Regions:
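Small-residue-biased structural context
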Residues: 2-169
Length: 169
């Protein structure tokens, strides 16, 4: 990535925060579509499906990998952060499972299969709320700690570990 020092931290953290903004926008759209499902109107299931395809690819495979690298460095410096870092790691795995479960339901719907509205809505809302709660912990706790604790060399290490992947949103 060719990032060093303070610039490296800025670039990495700006990307993570930008990703969260994009993800939050998508969650608003998902929530709107779950409201449509709840009201027994015709949701745009292809849109919801496309959002979940994105969510189960970029955030689950790239964004969370970068966070995990940052959080691992953080846990090396801040023993009080180990609990939240461990929690966030477990949540990354949980988010991937929840996302794939929701995506599988959406594939069935898009393919014309019958899926109970309340099951679909509850699965969608559970995913949305879990992800929002997860990002809130990162933004209020883990990100600020990492920004304070990691050295320039740590940010260089993280940057050199990141594959050059561009967020498709």
């Amino acid at each position: 990535m060719g990032i060093d020092g303070e610039n490296g931290m800025s670039t990495i953290m700006e990307q993570l925060k930008s990703d969260h903004i994009n993800i939050s926008r998508l969650l608003v759209t998902l929530e709107e579509q779950m409201d449509v499902v709840h009201d027994e109107r015709n949701a745009d299931f292809e849109l919801v499906h496309d959002i979940l395809v994105y969510m189960t690819h970029y955030p689950d495979h790239t964004h969370h990998t970068i966070e995990d690298l940052v959080f691992q460095k953080l846990s090396n410096y801040d023993s009080t952060a180990r609990s939240v870092v461990s929690q966030l790691g477990r949540e990354h795995a949980g988010l991937a499972k929840k996302g794939l479960r929701f995506l599988e339901m959406l594939r069935h719907v898009v393919d014309g299969a019958l899926v109970e509205r309340d099951v679909l809505e509850n699965t969608g809302r559970d995913y949305i709320e879990f992800l929002r709660s997860h990002m809130a912990i990162e933004e209020s706790d883990a990100f600020p700690r990492a920004e304070r604790a990691l050295s320039d060399e740590d940010w260089e290490d993280v940057a050199s570990s990141i594959e050059a992947r561009i967020d498709p949103v």
